Structures are given as structure tokens and as C-alpha cells.
Amino acid sequence: MVQLSYVIEFVGDMERAVKFYRDVVGLPLKFQSVGWSEFSTGDTTLGLHPASEKNTAGKVEIGLNVPDLHNFYDEMRAKGVKFSMPPKMQDFGGMLAQFEDSEGAYVSVSGK
């Protein structure tokens, strides 16, 4: 089963974005730093990451988790999805693949 694991918003001003989601929206802040902030939202994580030239402010990345990443990758490619990164072991120790959805949002998929 495909599960929504996280949503990352790329932000132009980390402090302003943290204040908005913490003080206005009311999400409990789990962690805050200059390069990453994270909120408690139940089973799904909301993360804030500094914007860059590639990931401009307001752009969103969606994170999915699947039980079998290689099988998911093969199924999605058979349906015409073009991956920007095939399944690859990451520095943090997890396996990850990436593609863009029909609207241009980045989607990262983790799994075994």
C-alpha cells in the first residue's frame, strides 16, 4: 500500500514560515534549525526546507512510502512515469527514487 509519509515546503524565510505554521496554523513544532524544520502532524511529517534556485519558495515535495520500491518503480515506469532518480541508496541509509507528478511537484518514494 502506498502511504503519504511527508510533505516538504521550500521556503524563502525559515523563521517566518515556522511562525506561520506554529503560531497561526497551530501545528506543534518538533524540530527547528536554519536548514530544516519539522512539525508534528500525526502520521505525516510537514517539513520546511530553505528554497534554492532549483526548489523555489512555495514549491512542494511529496514523500511516499511503499513496501517494495523496485516493484513500484517498475510499475510506474510501465505507466509512463519518468523518474529523475531511479531507486538509489541514500547517505541517511534509506532507499529513495524521485519523479515529478502531473503538475510538476517533486515526489520522493522510499521503501525496501
Predicted regions mapped to residue ranges:
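Vicinal oxygen chelate
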Residues: Y73-D74, K79-K112
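Short secondary-structure junctions
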Residues: G26-F31, S84-P86
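N-terminal beta-strand motif that seeds the catalytic metal site of vicinal oxygen chelate
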Residues: M1-R16, T45, V60-I62
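Short amphipathic alpha-helices within nucleic acid-binding modules
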Residues: F20, G58, H70-E75
